[in-house]
Curated annotation (Swiss-Prot):
UniProt protein name: IQ domain-containing protein F1
GO molecular function: calmodulin binding
PANTHER family in UniProt: IQ DOMAIN-CONTAINING PROTEIN F1, IQ MOTIF CONTAINING F
Gene Ontology biological process terms in this record: positive regulation of acrosome reaction; positive regulation of flagellated sperm motility involved in capacitation
Compositional bias annotation for Basic and acidic residues: 1-10, 31-43
Positions in coiled-coil regions: none
Lineage: Eukaryota, Metazoa, Chordata, Craniata, Vertebrata
Gene3D superfamilies: 1.20.5.190
Subunit structure, as described in the record: Interacts with calmodulin.
Localization terms from the record: Cytoplasmic vesicle, Secretory vesicle, Acrosome
InterPro entries: IQ_motif_EF-hand-BS, IQCF, P-loop_NTPase
Presence of the UniProt keyword Repeat in the record: yes
């Protein structure tokens, strides 16, 4: 009986040949399967973590893009609101400048017209005084004798002067337009 018992033990006992090889791969395969499943689980957890991180980063980027788009939209609305006011101010400024330039031109033209009329009036006044002084008989013997007459119509003065100096008379006839404001 001892031998019989030994034989089954010997059969069950590990030998250097086949039985050890069969047990080791079974142990190794189960260990590798466990390791693989553990790695898969770790990888799947890593993948899930990466996916969550990617989703969160995407959410942050979308949020910042939405914020930027909203800010741009607000600025565009403000600009559309303020642009007509700026254009109206610019138009009003240009109108004011044009009005000032026109006023300056009209004022300058008025001064020039006034100066020309005043100059014409002063010439006329001088001629009238000369005629009046000589008409009244205030003649100077050294200058000679001045005789003259004038006629005033609605728009001009007709002047005829005769100056007697030396040998012969000098006759001056002139029509002077009168400065009439319209």
């Amino acid at each position: 009986m001892g031998e019989e018992q030994q034989k089954p033990e010997e059969l069950n006992a590990p030998t250097d040949d086949a039985p050890q090889e069969k047990q080791q791969p079974a142990d190794l395969s189960s260990e590798t399967e466990k390791a693989k499943s553990k790695k898969k689980q770790e990888l799947s957890e890593k993948d899930q973590v990466v996916k969550i991180q990617a989703w969160w980063r995407g959410t942050l980027v979308r949020r910042s893009l939405l914020h930027a788009a909203l800010s741009a939209w607000i600025i565009q609305c403000w600009w559309r609101l303020i642009l007509p006011k700026i254009m109206e101010k610019r138009r009003q400024s240009m109108l004011d400048t044009f009005q000032q330039e026109q006023w300056a031109v009209v004022r300058l033209q008025s001064w020039i017209r006034m100066w020309r009329i005043r100059r014409r009036y002063c010439r006329l006044l001088k001629a009238v005084r000369t005629i009046q002084s000589h008409w009244r008989g205030h003649t100077c013997s050294s200058r000679g004798v001045i005789k003259g007459q004038y006629r005033i119509s609605t728009s001009q003065m007709h002047l005829e002067l005769e100056v007697l100096l030396g040998s012969g008379p000098c006759i001056v006839t002139e029509c002077i337009p009168l400065p009439i404001k319209q």
